[in-house]
UniProtKB/Swiss-Prot annotation:
Residues 1-27, 106-143, 157-409, 508-536 are annotated as: Disordered. Disulfide bonds: none annotated. The lineage of its organism: Eukaryota, Fungi, Dikarya, Basidiomycota, Agaricomycotina. It is found in: Nucleus; Cytoplasm. This is Velvet complex subunit B. Induction: Expression is down-regulated during fruiting body formation. Component of the heterotrimeric velvet complex composed of laeA, veA and velB; VeA acting as a bridging protein between laeA and velB. Forms a heterodimeric complex with vosA; the formation of the velB-vosA complex is light-dependent. The gene is velB. Residues 306-315, 356-399 have a biased composition (Basic and acidic residues). Gene3D superfamilies: Velvet domain. Residues 158-170, 190-265, 328-342 have a biased composition (Low complexity). PANTHER family: SPORE DEVELOPMENT REGULATOR VOSA, VELVET COMPLEX SUBUNIT B. Residues 1-26, 280-305, 400-409 have a biased composition (Polar residues). One of its GO terms (biological process) is sporulation resulting in formation of a cellular spore.
Length: 536
């Protein structure tokens, strides 16, 4: 129990506890514990707000513990177990009534002002520039093919002259299907940049000019030699037979020997629908596409895989923006918005990213490390979603804690040590040789004595440190001392005899260098100079 004590009875042969009202002691198990300052700091130079420049108090603060019995006789030092005694220190005002342990950090003034508005985040992938002049896109010039032509041909059951636009659109390849490029306006391609409905003449039999030398228009059906068994002439150099006009048998159904020798051929991917003429196709050519012929209607049936569902949904949702024919009021007018395939691809990427966040990168369950709410990573992700900069003060309490710093720098506690003073008298001392003050002013140190040993502490016999609350056994204040700025600092005071005595007992206390360094003294002796004392 912590309590204030009065002076011991008059006539005691031993020195009693200090009589200052700010200093007091307490009794525990019939013994009075007091604390006395035997060396007071006089002055110091302010160390500022850095952590490397340390300016210790001079001289160092030193306190001693005294224990009195009930008859006011002092207990000998050898009879005291000082293993678990320690003294804590903090900074107070000159009158000892106001605590001065915290000071406002000068660099924290900007944190106390209004928060700066968050800067808008720049988009990672800016949208492609729209066509503001309404001009059609530049034609894509496909590179010539010098190999054998790809065998795209009409279905077997329908003659070439009876092909309807629907069947022809599902069979005839487009430029983007054969070469992986966007279709451009060309005189020979049936899917030019026109915006009106395609005429039936676009699907008639190809002219003879389509089978000339390889060019941008050489995408019609191959010659009859392409349907027979492979031969050297098929894969050899380009010849007139490979690119000449096809015979009438090219468009007829295959013979029974050919049909029995070779399996039916799977058609290539269909061209884009009529609503997307003039826009870039976004079909995924890496997926297998199969085709068959309906026996009742003699029309091809195309089957694709389901991996492009996200992409097709994106194209369907943006068809009005990418197709100028979707709005009757815009009939014949060029489109000024991004194409449907670009917007669909952008939407499919966002959908795929959200799916990876939900299911994991490989489509399975998300096995990544969970993010705890309130953690640093969770706050960073929240800042990324809301567009908040890193420097914005998210937590006001953190900003307020960073505003203040400790005024008293250094170790704020000291263990008990048995030493001899300057008169060779033993005692239990507490040394504070590395204390610094950040700001200038007049202060006092408050010292408090406590014992952290387990019962029967503070009596001898404690086996360890207890985990509860330790009562304060005694309290004492030092005399006021002054902290100066670097320009006003008058200098370090003279070294005391007590500091020299402790230094001789291997206690590292800061001492004033009265004779300078050894090298300077040797140079002065060699040059015949005087050996006057110097102060630092």
């Amino acid at each position: 129990m912590i309590q204030r004590t009065t002076d011991p009875a008059a006539g005691s042969s031993t020195s009693g506890p200090p009589t200052n009202s700010l200093s007091w002691g307490s009794r525990h198990n019939g013994k009075l514990y007091t604390l006395e300052v035997v060396q007071h700091p006089i002055r110091a130079r302010m160390c500022g707000f850095g952590d490397k420049d340390r300016r210790p108090l001079a001289p160092a603060a030193v306190a001693t513990m005294n224990v009195y019995r009930e008859d006011n006789t002092q207990v000998e030092v050898d009879d005291i177990d000082c293993s678990f005694f320690l003294v804590t220190v903090d900074l107070w005002s000159e009158d000892g009534k106001q605590e001065m342990n915290l000071v406002l950090h000068p660099n924290a003034a900007q944190d106390r002002g209004p928060p700066m508005p968050a800067k808008p985040r720049r988009p990672t992938n800016p949208p492609p520039p729209s066509n503001t002049h309404g001009s059609p896109p530049a034609p894509a010039i496909p590179f010539p093919s010098y190999g054998p032509p790809t065998p795209y041909y009409p279905p077997w059951s329908a003659p070439a002259s009876d092909r309807s636009p629907s069947s022809a659109s599902a069979v005839l390849p487009s430029i983007s299907t054969s070469f992986g490029r966007a279709p451009g306006p060309s005189s020979a391609t049936p899917y030019g940049p026109q915006y009106g409905p395609p005429s039936a003449s676009s699907y008639g039999p190809p002219s003879a000019s389509a089978y000339g030398p390889p060019s941008a228009s050489a995408y019609g059906p191959p010659s009859a030699s392409a349907y027979g068994p492979p031969s050297a002439s098929t894969y050899g150099p380009s010849s007139a037979s490979a690119y000449g006009p096809p015979s009438s048998a090219s468009y007829g159904p295959p013979t029974s020997s050919y049909a029995s020798s070779y399996p039916p051929y799977h058609y290539g991917p269909p061209p884009p629908p009529f609503g997307n003429y003039g826009s870039t196709s976004n079909f995924d050519h890496s997926q297998p596409v199969t085709s068959s012929v309906d026996q009742e209607t003699n029309s091809p049936v195309v089957t694709t895989t389901a991996r492009d569902d996200d992409q097709r949904e994106g194209e369907a949702s943006t068809s009005a923006a990418g197709n100028p024919r979707a709005d009757p009021s815009n009939s014949g007018a060029p489109s000024t918005s991004p194409t449907a395939s670009t917007m669909g691809r952008r939407e499919s990427r966002g959908r795929r990213r959200r799916r990876e966040e939900r299911e994991g990168p490989d489509g399975g369950p998300d096995l990544r490390e969970p993010i705890e709410p309130g953690s640093t990573k969770a706050r960073e992700e929240e800042d990324a979603r809301t567009g908040t900069e890193k420097g914005d003060p998210k937590d006001k309490s953190d900003a307020q804690r960073a505003t203040y710093t400790r005024t008293l720098v250094g170790p704020l506690s000291s263990n008990a040590t048995r030493l001899l003073d300057e008169h060779r008298k033993p005692g239990i001392f507490f040394l504070f040789q590395d204390l610094s003050v950040r700001t200038e002013g007049t202060f006092r140190l408050r010292l408090r004595l406590m014992n952290v040993g387990a019962p029967p502490a503070p009596e001898p016999g404690a086996a360890g440190v207890h985990t509860g609350v330790s009562p304060v056994l005694a309290q004492v204040f030092t005399k006021p001392f002054t902290v100066f700025s670097a320009k006003r600092f008058p200098g370090v005071p003279d070294t005391t005899a007590l500091s020299i005595a402790f230094n001789q007992q291997n206690m590292k206390l800061p001492l004033r260098n009265r004779h300078g360094s050894g090298s300077k003294r040797r140079r002065r002796g060699a040059g015949g100079g005087s050996d006057d004392e110097e102060s630092d």
